[in-house]
């Protein structure tokens, strides 16, 4: 709203846009990363400014300002003159109970016109991408507006040049680490494969050889465990950038939660919206992976692309497209990318869930007889590729050097040192409740559905309950007898165990048995 009045000489003076004050009440409502403001239906500000449900509103507290989406309260949750904020908005403004906020209409968004440009199929410049990414990060674009940008950028609608510009804009939105070493290696797995916890084996092998590998990893959002969740069962992962640097300079490597360091922070927002609309865009995936690697300060990256019917990458043609984009865009941005297409047809190792996956990792690092060989072999292949980034390692010899570092115990010793440097090694916990799922008939395992198995592990409590998840006893190609356990569900509570068992009754085709040949 603008106010105008007559000046002494008869001219009209227009004052700046007015804002209105409301007193804050803490409601304690979590909306993840979405800024929401709650106002009464009869609020005088709503009426005077024409605010309606879902209106985007500028909210200012002192020197801090955000744009929030309006939700209207029809009960007595708020008193007249009060407003509430979602926890995310509350923390963004550093608000306290009783603080007075100012609310007003925000300025028109330049970024929204660029989103429209992309919707109509036109190519975006780096400057336009940067404006969009800055508004994504600051919360000026709503989730609905972000989803429009993501949809307009999916299904091959981003050119290779646009993917490069988007990647660069995402890197420039956060911090960028630099290291003393001229060669810095990073490793990434595209995902969709339960139990594929190779990072915890690759990092100590590479660090023990003497190469620098500062690994930032994510927590689970839709899976039973992220690498950070699994590592957290063994050592602290929430390290400040200063502490992370100290660990890497001391031990050549680390395995920390990426959320504690501001590397390509806009990516976290885009991923959250992508998952909400169940959208996988190859252009966005490439920008997401490469922006994180480059922001970490990597000069070389080894990327594992598991391919399988229930993995994230479902077929060979999609895998080859992803491989080409990662290598070409990485090269244009000064990152040497090496991709490996691997078997994504079934889970890796025995454990699915933080503690159970950590148990498998420790078995491999310690060379125990019951260590899962598939996890060991995948980790050695990836570690070998990482070692071959160094001119000291001839092509083709990386895996044998990695094997020697693992079998000699040097990798385990380095892993212990990294854990101690990050804050101390922890003992693994075990679940209170277990339930074995047995074979209804004798046969050979012909198919394992990664997604359904992961869903059961999540219903059992993973990753929030660190010891919850699934212990997989049979893999594809193995024969089982009638009544033999196929997998065991682990849970911290009987209620969560019942939830997981309920899903079992609905979905009988998680592990399919064929005839013994």
Swiss-Prot record:
Its EC number is 2.4.2.4. GO terms for molecular function: 1,4-alpha-oligoglucan phosphorylase activity; thymidine phosphorylase activity. It catalyses: thymidine + phosphate = 2-deoxy-alpha-D-ribose 1-phosphate + thymine. GO terms for cellular component: cytosol. It holds the Pfam family Glycos_trans_3N. Gene3D superfamilies: 1.20.970.50, 2.40.40.20, Nucleoside phosphorylase/phosphoribosyltransferase catalytic domain, Pyrimidine nucleoside phosphorylase-like, C-terminal domain. It is an enzyme of class 2 (transferase). Belongs to the thymidine/pyrimidine-nucleoside phosphorylase family. Type 2 subfamily. HAMAP family: Thymid_phosp_2 (MF_00703). This is Putative thymidine phosphorylase. It comes from Legionella pneumophila (strain Paris).
